[in-house]
Amino acid sequence: MNPVPAQREYFLDSIRAWLMLLGIPFHISLIYSSHTWHVNSAEPSLWLTLFNDFIHSFRMQVFFVISGYFSYMLFLRYPLKKWWKVRVERVGIPMLTAIPLLTLPQFIMLQYVKGKAESWPGLSLYDKYNTLAWELISHLWFLLVLVVMTTLCVWIFKRIRNNLENSDKTNKKFSMVKLSVIFLCLGIGYAVIRRTIFIVYPPILSNGMFNFIVMQTLFYLPFFILGALAFIFPHHKALFTTPSRGCTLAAALAFVAYLLNQRYGSGDAWMYETESVITMVLGLWMVNVVFSFGHRLLNFQSARVTYFVNASLFIYLVHHPLTLFFGAYITPHITSNWLGFLCGLIFVVGIAIILYEIHLRIPLLKFLFSGKPVVKRENDKAPAR
């Protein structure tokens, strides 16, 4: 069994927090991009579209690698049932809390903003269910995927641990070239599965719950397991924390391919399948770029960094309805896209931090948005002197 490191790896905490917080400029730039969203500016911005595409091309792949890393670390710390319970509580409770408090009001607001409130009664029962699935899960989809992955990894992590106990761990080494080939094959495999579903029964791909539970889990599970393997094998982790010009160049070329596919691809042809292959290998190479950068610059402890590490999930959860509110009611009054983008950042981040500070002072909300029980310190119980 792999021992749990005594020293906290601050750069991974920081990277995870920054990836979470990158969701704010990602969604605000989406308003000003050429991509169709719930709310859009009058004229799209080429540079904000490029910025949006860059974040979207790798952010969640790297995030799930870090999630897998910490999940396996906790897997070794707790008994199996307690591990599953702790992990599911920490992602499931915030997700279930955010649905009635955040995404339901967000959905109601959008119904009126987009003029769809009048047509809602005329929808079929399935259309109502599917619309609610997409709109209520919304930006919480990664929490649902983490619940599914944690449940699957009850079996997967047990198999990994049993195989380690019956084999020589020192001989299990992979080069970045070998990992690239593996992830290329995984991307092609995912593309084949998606194309097969598209041929056999295309309507299922527009089903919200199927998309989140099956397709998103299927795509990101290799990154989650890669994170676990990086925790187990120091050599694998070193592949990602050691700067590689090859990975940087390959990631840059893959991003160009991603942009070309976005520009010239067609949803009726092979655009989505091509994107899955590109983003699978791009995500792998960006793990090296992000980890090596973070290991060099973010591997330290500070009160300010710790604050945003702790606040990142809450800020991410509340930023989405704030962003849509800004896009619906404030964006139309700002003619400059870049000024609107900067104002959006100030508006969303400012209010999110205020809400975070308020929720810290309400124990029930603090529990509901973190999934962690509030533990009173012994000093708090001591009588005043």
UniProtKB/Swiss-Prot annotation:
Pathway stated in the Swiss-Prot or TrEMBL entry: Glycan metabolism; osmoregulated periplasmic glucan (OPG) biosynthesis
Single Gene Ontology MF annotation: acyltransferase activity, transferring groups other than amino-acyl groups
GO CC annotation, single: plasma membrane
Top-level lineage group: Bacteria
A Pfam family hit: Acyl_transf_3
Keywords, comma-separated and alphabetical: Acyltransferase, Cell membrane, Membrane, Transferase, Transmembrane, Transmembrane helix
EC number: 2.1.-.-
Membrane topology type: Multi-pass membrane protein
Cell compartment(s), UniProt: Cell membrane
UniProt record, GO biological process: glucan biosynthetic process
Main location: membrane
Keyword Phosphoprotein: no
Stretches that traverse the bilayer: 17-37, 60-80, 91-111, 137-157, 173-193, 212-232, 239-259, 274-294, 311-331, 338-358
Signal sequence coordinates: none
Function: Necessary for the succinyl substitution of periplasmic glucans. Could catalyze the transfer of succinyl residues from the cytoplasmic side of the membrane to the nascent glucan backbones on the periplasmic side of the membrane.
Protein family according to the UniProt entry: Belongs to the acyltransferase 3 family. OpgC subfamily.
HAMAP family, per the entry: MdoC_OpgC
Annotated protein name in UniProt: Glucans biosynthesis protein C
Species name: Escherichia coli O139:H28 (strain E24377A / ETEC)
